[in-house]
C-alpha cells in the first residue's frame, strides 16, 4: 500500500479556500529544492531532529539490530540494518525520532478528510493530494480516494510535477477539479509539458496549470 507522511489541516496555500492536504511518500524526481525532502523515498524511514538531540544514546541501546551507533556523541543510523521496528522512536527521551510514512486504508483516510467538511463548504475549499508525487502512487489507490471525495461533493486538487505516464492522468481526470502543476526543468521538462498540455486539452475549464 502507498504511504502518507502527513495530513495537514487548515491549509490555505494548496488551492482555493481552507483545505486538508495529504502528503504522499515517494517521488520519481529528486529535486534539490524540494519542499518536502522526507517524502522523496517510497519506503518508510526513520528521521530525527538533530538540533534537539541530547546525545543520550538510548536509541543505540534499545535497537535490537545494531542499526544505531554513537559516533562523537551523536547517533548514526545504518539504514541497511534498520528494520523499522520503532523501538528507537518509542524510547527516545526527547520524542524527536519518528518513522516517516504510514499506511491509510481508503475508508480511514476519507473519514479523516470528511471531518473538515464544514470548513470546505464555508470557504470554497476542499482536499489537496500532494507529496512527494501523488501521481506516482498506485492508480487504484488514488482513484478510489478521488471517487470517494467526488461522491461526497468535495473539491479535489492534485499537486503534481507531472512526471508520470499520461495514462495515470487519464484515469483520474473525471474526478479532479484542479491540477496544480509546478514548472520543472532538466530531463523532466518535456514530460511535464506534454502531460500538462493533454490535461488542459481534455479537461478544459476545470483544470489549471500553475
Describe each region flagged by the PLM.
Residues 1-3:
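Extreme N-terminal starter segment of soluble prokaryotic enzymes
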Amino acid at each position: 500500500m502507498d504511504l502518507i507522511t502527513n495530513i495537514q489541516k487548515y491549509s490555505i496555500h494548496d488551492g482555493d479556500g481552507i483545505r486538508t492536504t495529504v502528503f504522499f511518500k515517494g517521488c520519481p524526481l529528486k529535486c534539490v529544492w524540494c519542499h518536502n525532502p522526507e517524502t522523496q523515498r517510497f519506503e518508510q524511514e526513520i528521521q530525527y531532529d538533530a538540533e534537539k538531540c541530547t546525545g543520550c544514546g538510548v536509541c543505540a541501546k534499545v535497537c535490537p539490530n545494531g542499526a544505531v551507533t554513537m559516533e562523537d556523541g551523536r547517533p548514526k543510523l545504518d539504514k541497511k540494518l534498520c528494520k523499522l521496528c520503532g523501538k528507537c522512536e518509542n524510547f527516545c527521551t526527547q520524542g524527536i525520532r519518528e518513522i516517516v510514512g504510514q499506511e491509510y486504508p481508503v475508508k480511514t483516510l476519507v473519514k479523516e478528510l470528511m471531518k473538515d467538511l464544514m470548513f470546505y463548504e464555508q470557504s470554497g475549499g476542499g482536499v489537496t493530494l500532494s507529496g512527494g508525487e501523488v501521481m506516482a502512487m498506485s492508480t487504484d489507490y488514488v482513484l478510489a480516494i478521488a471517487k470517494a471525495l467526488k461522491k461526497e461533493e468535495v473539491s479535489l486538487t492534485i499537486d503534481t510535477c507531472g512526471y508520470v505516464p499520461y495514462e495515470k492522468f487519464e484515469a483520474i481526470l473525471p474526478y479532479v477539479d484542479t491540477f496544480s502543476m509546478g514548472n520543472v526543468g532538466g530531463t523532466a521538462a518535456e514530460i511535464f509539458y506534454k502531460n500538462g498540455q493533454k490535461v488542459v486539452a481534455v479537461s478544459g475549464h476545470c483544470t489549471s496549470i500553475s
